[in-house]
C-alpha cells in the first residue's frame, strides 16, 4: 500500500511559520492553513506526533546562516517523531503506519527543509529516518535524533575507543547528556569526566560520568589529569586543548575552533539511529528530557524562550501536535 486514503490526508495543516528573520518571539506565527508538503519519490509523509527544539532552530530564525538557508517562509523544527501516512515510489525501508523518528535535515546549515516538524505533517527523506524503538514514547523519541547523532559522530571523529578517557564540556546539555552515555555504554571509555553547573552534577553522575566537574568552582583545564579525548559542546576549545593528552583529540560543535581542535557539523543519517537502537531498547542509553517538557503546540514561542535562556537540562519537546 503506497498511501493512506487521500481523503484522510488534508491539503492544509496547522503549523508555526517564520516569514522573516529575527527573534523567535517576534517572527514565529501560528498559521492554521499551511499547505501540506508534496513528497518526492524517496520521501515519506509523516503525521507528526512530537517535535523537539534545538539551538539551530533559533540561530536559523536569527539569520545566522541565511546565505545557505532555504527561502522564507519556513516552518522550523529539525527533530521529528510520528507515523508514516504516505510513501514515495522509491521508498523501501518504510510503509504506511510505521512509527519513525529522525532529524529532517541531512545537513543542518545548508538548504534545510522549508517544512520542519512544527506542523501536523512533514515530508522527510527516507535516509534520515529510523524506526522508533518500541520502548520509547513519541516524546522521548523526538528528543533524540540530532543530539544523539551529533554525540555519536563527534566520538567517532575523536576516535574514542575502549580503554580511553574522555572529558565532556557541557555534560548536561542536549548533546552532552548523550556524549556521556555513548562514551560509557557504546564506545567503552575507561573514564568519563564532564562539566556542568552545581545543580546539574547529580545528573552527570546518573548518566554515567565518573567525574563531575563544577565549572562554577573549578577550571577543568587546570586539573593535573589530562584526557585522551575532549568533546566540547559549549564553545571553549581554547581551554579544551589544554585538557587533552599529547596526541589526543579535541572535537567541538561550536566554532571557532582553536587548533588542534576539530570543528564539525553533523551529517544526519537514519542508519546511526538504527545502529544505536539496541542500546536504546535495552535502556543503556536513555533520552533526557527537560523537566518542563512537553510544551503544548500552542506554547511553541514560550518553549523557544525557555530554550534560548540556556536553562534547559536535556531536550525541550513539543507535544501533542494536533
From Swiss-Prot:
CDD domains: MDR_like_2 (cd05289)
InterPro entries: ADH-like_N (IPR013154), AOR-like (IPR044626), GroES-like_sf (IPR011032), NAD(P)-bd_dom_sf (IPR036291), PKS_ER (IPR020843), Quin_OxRdtase/zeta-crystal_CS (IPR002364)
Transmembrane regions listed in the UniProt entry: none
Organism per entry: Fragaria vesca
Catalytic activity: 4-hydroxy-2,5-dimethyl-furan-3(2H)-one + NADP(+) = 4-hydroxy-5-methyl-2-methylenefuran-3(2H)-one + NADPH + H(+)
Binding residue positions for substrate: 59
Annotated protein name in UniProt: 2-methylene-furan-3-one reductase
Pfam family, one: ADH_N
Family stated for the protein in its record: Belongs to the zinc-containing alcohol dehydrogenase family. Quinone oxidoreductase subfamily.
Binding annotation for NADP(+): 59, 174-175, 197-200, 215, 253, 264-266, 311-312
Keywords: NAD, NADP, Oxidoreductase
Gene Ontology molecular-function annotations: furaneol oxidoreductase activity; zinc ion binding
Enzyme Commission number, as recorded: 1.3.1.105
The keyword Oxidoreductase appears for this protein: yes
Lineage of the organism: Eukaryota, Viridiplantae, Streptophyta, Embryophyta, Tracheophyta
SMART domains linked to this entry: PKS_ER
Function per UniProt: Enone oxidoreductase involved in the biosynthesis of 4-hydroxy-2,5-dimethyl-3(2H)-furanone (HDMF or furaneol), the key flavor compound in strawberries.
Assembly with partners or alone: Monomer.
